[in-house]
């Protein structure tokens, strides 16, 4: 009789330990690299982790209206050897420990359109190589403004998506704007 009770107790204790481990793993965010060349920040990081990884931001901004979030700005970064401004968008309030990186935006300006064209192709090649093995990979490109809300100066846009991240690259005269969103 004691053997049966001890066996049942061990069974229920191991089941409880398994449930606690599953709960702890489910509550931890999955970190997915942004994919931006030279960027060590990952989707799912909190603000403190980002500042430890990328250093103190050059600027911050909070949005506490219909959408709640905040932004960390880094003005003196490099992407593929070119100067860039990088901003990280967090969902949630800045004081919340649960606020996580949800989007990264990169803004780059060039002296000539040829440099801009080369960077566009380099970024597309980088993200294509990075993402084409991921589930639900897709790539789409368009020339000029297509949607009603596209700015008239838009030269072309490229979208590269997968199950892990979505990349949107917009090319303007001598300027590229890149957005990467985590899909996790």
Task: State where each predicted segment sits.
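N-terminal Sec-pathway targeting helices
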Residues: 1-17
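Membrane-interface motif at the C-terminal end of an N-terminal transmembrane signal
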Residues: 19-33
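N-terminal leader/targeting segments
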Residues: 31-93
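Generic beta-strand hydrophobic packing signal
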Residues: 60, 102-104, 163
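Short, ordered beta-strand-loop transition motifs
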Residues: 61-68, 94-97, 137-143, 168-172
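Short beta-strand micro-motifs in enzyme catalytic cores
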Residues: 67-73, 145-147, 176
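Long, charged/polar, surface-exposed segments that mediate recognition or autoinhibition
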Residues: 81-146
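An acidic-aromatic pocket/loop used at catalytic or ligand-binding sites
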Residues: 109-111, 148, 152-184
